[in-house]
Amino acid sequence: MSDSSKERKKKFTGMVNKQKSEDQQNNSKQADDLDELKTLKERAVQLEDHLRRAVADNENVKRIMQKQISDANDYAVTKFARDMIDSCDNLKRVMEILKDDDPVHEGIKVAYKKIMNDLKKHGIEEIDPIGELFDSNLHQAVVEREDNEKKTGTIVEVLQTGYTIKNRLLRPAMVIISKKNC
């Protein structure tokens, strides 16, 4: 082989090796790029998941806050309502003491009915449990009375009227319940 042929072969081999080296570098760069792309995709999935959770948490907080605001509006008058029902109890006691034909009795009766109507407009309802079975969520049993005609636990008398405000207990009814004579 001649020197020029050797030189061409060497040059050709050098070019092939250079090309192989460049191909390997390109392949290595492509592999690095693919790894980076895979990592970025995984990170995007994680961020998307975090975003979904954050949006869901935000919606939950919003719903809870709306419920709390609604409850605050509904039950803000609770203390005032308790004071008013105590006043109604006092008016009832006065009406029981006064005679029906007393003009003061009639005036108190009108005032009592007006207050009760106003309370009802604001979601405050009386609990009238006579004849119902005792329910510890709504009633407070004060006395048991023997009564063989009624089922045990039936409310036979109300000592103090109970009230609810928008279906939530404001004050339990104080009651006398029946029990069987053993």
Curated annotation (Swiss-Prot):
Keyword annotations for this protein, in alphabetical order, are: Chaperone, Cytoplasm, Stress response
Cellular component GO terms, alphabetically?
A: cytoplasm
Q: List where in the cell it is found.
A: Cytoplasm
Matching Pfam families, A to Z? GrpE
Question: What GO terms describe the biological role, i.e. biological process, of this protein?
Answer: protein folding
Q: Region (Disordered): which ranges?
A: 1-37
| PROSITE patterns in the record | GRPE
GO-annotated molecular function = adenyl-nucleotide exchange factor activity; protein homodimerization activity; protein-folding chaperone binding; unfolded protein binding
Q: In which family does this protein belong, per the annotation?
A: Belongs to the GrpE family.
Function noted in UniProt: Participates actively in the response to hyperosmotic and heat shock by preventing the aggregation of stress-denatured proteins, in association with DnaK and GrpE. It is the nucleotide exchange factor for DnaK and may function as a thermosensor. Unfolded proteins bind initially to DnaJ; upon interaction with the DnaJ-bound protein, DnaK hydrolyzes its bound ATP, resulting in the formation of a stable complex. GrpE releases ADP from DnaK; ATP binding to DnaK triggers the release of the substrate protein, thus completing the reaction cycle.
What PANTHER family does the entry give? Answer: GRPE PROTEIN, GRPE PROTEIN HOMOLOG, MITOCHONDRIAL
Q: How does the annotation summarize its subunit structure?
A: Homodimer.
This protein's name = Protein GrpE
